[in-house]
């Protein structure tokens, strides 16, 4: 399973990218607004740091508005993926953009039907929201398993980006369910490679080594 960073904090992306395990980045209007910087400038800077897909979301509501925005965003960098909301107008936009060879990430998916519709429209990625589904008592892992089964059974090319990840348990859970990708907030990313027992073990090793050298 691939790891994407769900942030637009360029300094954090640069710091974590050096680990060699960041496969892409996702953003949305909320995340971009926190940075207080020009949208295009931020996306271009991220694309210079990360080689993998970088999702940048449209803000238009009609098909024509989304397609116009998407065509412009797609010009910014070869690894830009245009994020489109799961709506009737969004599906129409994805269908058109797919014909033009523009990569898309259909976001805010909460049902199998929505995911399948996005696949049929030609979405490059589909993003089911794990945390938000759990908030309403829905089994998000079952959704991801079902979507992966549909992709494999019918031969769709879409990849699943598990979004709304709120902790290590979500990352591990979606990996077990067959998500192709988990997009993870930068604040959660450290949990992928840290553990108190690891720290304690290192401390013990160093203490024992120091005692050995003093003999």
UniProtKB/Swiss-Prot annotation:
GO molecular function, one term: aldehyde-lyase activity
Gene3D superfamilies assigned: Aldolase class I
A Pfam family per the record: TAL_FSA
Active-site annotation: 83 (schiff-base intermediate with substrate)
InterPro entries associated with the record: Aldolase_TIM, TAL/FSA, Transaldolase_3B, Transaldolase_3B/F6P_aldolase, Transaldolase_AS, TSA/FSA_arc/bac
Enzyme Commission designation: 2.2.1.2
Gene Ontology CC, one term: cytoplasm
Domain of life: Bacteria
Keyword Calcium: no
This protein's record includes keyword Hydrolase: no
Catalytic reaction equation(s): D-sedoheptulose 7-phosphate + D-glyceraldehyde 3-phosphate = D-erythrose 4-phosphate + beta-D-fructose 6-phosphate
Similarity comment text for this entry: Belongs to the transaldolase family. Type 3B subfamily.
Function field: Transaldolase is important for the balance of metabolites in the pentose-phosphate pathway.
PANTHER family documented for this protein: TRANSALDOLASE
Full protein name: Probable transaldolase
Gene: tal
């Amino acid at each position: 399973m691939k790891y994407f960073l769900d942030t637009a904090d360029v300094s954090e992306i640069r710091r974590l990218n050096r680990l060699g395990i960041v496969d892409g980045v996702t953003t949305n209007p909320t995340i971009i607004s926190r940075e207080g910087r020009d949208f295009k400038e931020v996306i271009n800077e991220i694309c210079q740091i990360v080689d993998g897909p970088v999702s940048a979301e449209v803000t238009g509501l009609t098909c024509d508005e989304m397609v116009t925005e998407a065509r412009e965003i797609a010009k910014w960098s070869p690894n830009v993926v245009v994020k489109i909301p799961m709506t009737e107008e969004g599906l129409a936009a994805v269908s058109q953009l797919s014909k033009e060879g523009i990569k898309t990430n259909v976001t805010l998916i909460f049902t199998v039907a929505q995911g399948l519709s996005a696949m049929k429209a030609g979405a490059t990625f589909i993003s089911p929201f794990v945390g938000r589904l759990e908030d309403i008592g829905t089994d998000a892992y079952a959704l991801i398993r079902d979507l992966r089964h549909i992709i494999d059974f019918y031969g769709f090319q879409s990849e699943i980006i598990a979004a709304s990840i709120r902790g290590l348990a979500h990352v591990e859970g979606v990996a077990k369910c067959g998500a192709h990708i988990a997009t993870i907030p930068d604040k959660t990313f450290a949990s992928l490679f840290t553990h108190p027992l690891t720290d304690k073990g290192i401390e013990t090793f160093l203490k024992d080594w120091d005692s050995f050298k003093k003999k």
